[in-house]
Amino acid sequence: MSSISNELSVTSSQNVISNSKEQRKKKILFKCALTNTISDVLTNREGWAQTQGDDWQFFWVTREWMTTCYDKHKFSEKQMICHFRNDFELTRKDFLIKNYKKARKAKEKSGIDVVSEFNFLPSSYVLPTEYHLFVEEFRKYPNDTIWIMKPVAGAQGKGIFLFRKLKHVQEWKKKDSSGSEALPYVVQCYVHNPYLVGGKKFDVRIYVLVTSFRPLNAWVHREGFARFSHSRYSTDSVDDAFVHLTNVAVAKTAADYDPERGLKWSLPKLFRFFKSVHGQSKLSKTMNDLTNVIIESLKSVQNLIIQDNHCFELYGYDILFDENLKPWLLEVNASPSLTASSQEDFELKYRILNHMIDVLDIEKKLIGNENEVGGFDLLIKNSKPVELCKVDFHTQPFFGTQFNLRLGDYVEATPMP
């Protein structure tokens, strides 16, 4: 009796294991190296299951993994990861400047008026290598011109400072070059006339998904946000980070910081505000200019980024508008923060990441000729810009396109843990 019972137990266990394997075969297996919103999205996505092995189809990797494991990993046909091997060509500030200047020079040689057609980075130099070129440029500007210094790989506002006098850069240069190569920084002419709302400076975060560089295929999400500085704008003091920087990490250090107080606007809200103040025609031009900034910046690195069909990347574009609504590119982030600062922020990032997975179409639900998926609009297909729908900005949120209901309405976000 005992042996029969044991046999039944073994058979039952084998069936459970077999059924478990069958269930896993039907699911899309993922790994995730982070524990923020992307982890929540993947865990809650229907038909997906987490794995600790190498049988994953989707892996949200870290920058460290790309550095240490990418070259060694043997990808299977269906595996996808969230970074391109040398995305730094676009996302490291010194490389961004170098590639922008190279593309600008090529356009100038071909007879294009770069002042009007290719002019979206402020005057910029990489230090210490371009120090003498910077000094030459510095002396052409009025004495009260403000410049801004940024570490090439910095984030969250760390290491940034503003100055008016050359001696401040000379002091930095002396301090950072103690017998070894100085820490690279970029120096840029500060956009002194930013567009202000309620007397405050702001920049905008736009999410751009690149699924291929050759050919160039890129999508832009209609949602995003404007980040406002903590204090009202003034050029009287260049040392007050609460006035000049819009990073949430900086604002959080203020004694009276309140994440729910309204230091962020949604992009649709911002663009509706622009329209109410400046009219549809002006807003349309700004949208065209903004689209051009994204497209041209991607084209400038199209032939430099290592193309790999296993890779995609969600970039965070940081844009500043001046008082004339001209967009200036501040930087491109390879790892835009996915950690939520509020419930509203969580829901926004949850939607964007869910729509990103829809675009990647790992589940094979799409036909293949879609121009809109979730909140994403196709911006460039096979290296050619896509004509976007023209609708009323008063009712529609971003880039003049309609909501796409092909995959249903926005997925409702789960509560923040």
Swiss-Prot record:
The EC category is ligase
| UniProt keyword terms in alphabetical order | ATP-binding, Ligase, Nucleotide-binding
| Pfam families xrefs | TTL
Q: Which GO terms describe its cellular component?
A: ciliary basal body
Single GO biological process annotation from the record:
microtubule cytoskeleton organization
Q: Per its record, what are the GO molecular function terms?
A: ATP binding; metal ion binding; tubulin binding; tubulin-glutamic acid ligase activity
Q: Which residues form the TTL domain?
A: 23-372
Is Ligase tagged as a keyword?
yes
Source organism, top-level taxon: Eukaryota
Q: In which tissues is it expressed?
A: Expressed in head sensory neurons.
Q: Which InterPro entries match?
A: ATP-grasp (IPR011761), TTL/TTLL_fam (IPR004344)
Q: Which residues form the signal peptide?
A: none
The EC number(s) given in the record are 6.-.-.-
List positions binding ATP. Q188, C189, Y190, V191, K201, D203
Q: What family does the database annotate?
A: Belongs to the tubulin--tyrosine ligase family.
Its annotated function is as follows:
Polyglutamylase that forms polyglutamate side chains on tubulin. Acts when complexed with other proteins. Appears to be dispensable for polar spindle formation in dividing embryonic cells, for cilia-dependent osmotic avoidance and for male mating behavior. Probably by regulating microtubule stability via the glutamylation of tubulin, regulates PLM axon developmental growth.
Q: What is this protein called?
A: Probable tubulin polyglutamylase ttll-9
Q: Name the species this protein comes from.
A: Caenorhabditis elegans
Gene that specifies this protein: ttll-9
